[in-house]
Amino acid sequence: MNLINEKLNNLENNATKSPKEAVILLNMGGPNSLYEVGVFLKNMFDDPFILTIKNNFMRKMVGKMIVNSRIEKSKKIYEKLGGKSPLTPITFALTERLNKLDPSRFYTYAMRYTPPYASMVLQDLALKEVESLVFFSMYPQYSSTTTLSSFNDAFNALKALETFRPKVRVIERFYASKKLNEIILNTILSTLNNRKSQDFVLIFSVHGLPKSVIDAGDTYQQECEHHVNLLKELVQQKNISFKEVLLSYQSKLGPMKWLEPSTEELIEKHRKSHIIIYPLAFTIDNSETLYELDMQYRLMAERLAVKEYLVCPCLNDSIEFAKFIIELVNNLKSE
């Protein structure tokens, strides 16, 4: 009987100690299997922040055509990555690390286009009787196509839970943080692995957007350019020199005018140099970093006889990035 009482007391104590604040890392998601490739593409191209066609019927029709034209190619890409996107398991590993480093909060994640969706995660947090939330965008720079889309989805999911009304705060961008940029620079230097930085053209490659999105008022291009300028300043402060430091845009889709220069253009332009690429718009590795940058563009670099071609990893579940996230949330609490 004493053993039973002891276990009941432990359960009560654990319930009392359960964190009352949760931090939800928001990202785009990625297929967790080849079966989910279709789900991922369908949800992405049905997103009005991605495919900005106001008429729902027309958007679904156009989205369906895009999905049908891309699904087999996308499946082949994910086959090369082991049959799934690395984004979800890496994000899970990051939350595991965060929960160990900061047990005062509960860290979890929600994806925009694949499970776990925000609605699923928020239902779980409601059962946990969480009192406050932080919606944490995993995109360093703000864009309506990423940050706003994720926040809109999360707030709509929260609104649907009529009896769950926690206090909500948001972290919508963090590219200007010197701490973040020091972590990025250290990642670049680690990838160089004692090679001479002055021999390398450093290309900060970010996900591209149609020019029309920027013309409509999206601040993404401005923030990416500002981010690169901050990193240039940091490089100078640390007395590190590169042959050149450049910004480029990848992943162009369709015939529309997109942001320039493209990453492919810069690789070709600097084919007689050593090149190192850092994926500046992503914090977690995904198909655009591991396939597009590290496989597809690497083959291009080899074909062009680029002297050396290096691709840096994203911040992923590194302890440095985890500590940075905790610091951002702590600073948010004191504001």
Curated annotation (Swiss-Prot):
Catalyzed chemical reaction(s): heme b + 2 H(+) = protoporphyrin IX + Fe(2+)
Broad class of where this protein is predominantly found: cytoplasm
Sample GO molecular function, one term: ferrochelatase activity
Subcellular localization, as worded in the UniProt entry: Cytoplasm
Pathway annotation from the record: Porphyrin-containing compound metabolism; protoheme biosynthesis; protoheme from protoporphyrin-IX: step 1/1
Binding positions for Fe cation per the UniProt entry: 207, 288
EC primary class: lyase
E.C. number: 4.98.1.1
HAMAP family, A to Z: Ferrochelatase
UniProt similarity note: Belongs to the ferrochelatase family.
Protein name: Ferrochelatase
